[in-house]
Design a protein with these regions (language model features):
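Long C-terminal interaction/binding lobes of large macromolecular proteins
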Residues: 1-285
């Protein structure tokens, strides 16, 4: 069989396939991506396509939402330059999802909120372009100074962030065990102990994995096993400082609380807007 015969036949409909709707700059500037996980742009801007029907269905699949798989598949579909979204730095996730929503539904997002004063259901429009610009203006701080050490950190990957979200569910399971009146006290203690150990180990491993290098008065330490051992054996204040720095860096670029006024009673209140994909992509402006 000739090479011409085995080549994939070009689709005459390809000229009507999706085209990029917008271009987005990533807050990380393309840093912190492992080799092969990002097709780096020379301009720093990446094409963003609107979601397909399949992409929208992904955000309606509970199991895929819970595991993070839906987010991974949609980012791969709509921002193909990000070839392995599991390894993308967490500081790029919100920017990517906002850009995808803009490309799919437009620059404004309609949200609803009940007034805490009169219970009136209000509707507001959020300017996502303004939001995206504010995210891109933010810079990640890669060093934590704990004299005489300097801890060099990287942001969570999306995989690690998903594991952190699952950790929250594990917390809930622990509380459910404690409040389960049908279980004996011995069973409660045993299951609580196992869950707590699992949760603690996951937390420590994720934080240790975000430490790329430690600068000491005697030089730099980059060996990951040695860094893991240090994190596991460091004083609590050292661990808490590193953990808080990494977490704060992520929270600093999350969608800010909106200060709004009720359309009925005119009183003002704070309205949180989340990046929970199940509602972020369900509400169209």
């Amino acid at each position: 069989m000739s090479d011409n015969n085995v080549q994939k036949k070009s689709n005459p409909l390809s000229q009507w396939f999706r085209q990029p709707k917008i271009f987005v700059k990533l807050p990380s500037s393309g840093n912190y991506y492992p080799a092969g996980s990002l097709d780096k742009s020379t301009t720093g801007e990446y094409p963003v396509y609107a979601m397909t029907a399949k992409d929208e269905l992904m955000f309606k699949t509970p199991d895929a939402l819970l595991s993070g798989q839906s987010t991974v598949e949609v980012i791969k579909s709509c921002i193909p330059a990000i070839q392995d979204p599991w390894t993308m730095p967490s500081l790029d996730i919100d920017a990517a999802l906002i850009a995808i929503r803009i490309a799919t539904y437009g620059e404004n997002m309609g949200v609803e909120a009940n007034c805490p004063h009169c219970e009136h259901l209000n509707e507001y429009d959020i300017d996502l372009v303004k939001w995206l610009d504010s995210i891109n203006a933010w810079k990640f701080v890669p060093e934590v100074e704990i004299p005489p050490l300097i801890i060099h950190v990287r942001p969570y990957t999306y995989k690690e962030l998903s594991q952190t979200s699952l950790k929250t569910l594990e917390h809930q399971r622990i509380f459910n065990v404690i409040n389960n009146e049908e279980m004996s006290d011995e069973d409660k203690v045993e299951r609580f102990g196992k869950s707590f150990i699992k949760l603690t180990e996951l937390t420590v491993d994720i934080i240790a994995g975000c430490v790329a290098k430690i600068t000491t008065p005697d030089g730099d330490v980059t060996d990951q096993e040695q860094i893991q051992e240090f994190i596991r054996n460091s004083p609590r204040d050292v661990f808490d400082t590193v953990s808080k720095h990494i977490t704060d860096m992520k929270e600093n670029i999350e969608l800010p609380i909106q200060h709004v006024a009720c359309n009925e009673c005119l009183k003002e209140f704070d309205m949180p807007v989340t990046m929970d994909q199940s509602n972020f992509f369900a509400v169209r402006s």
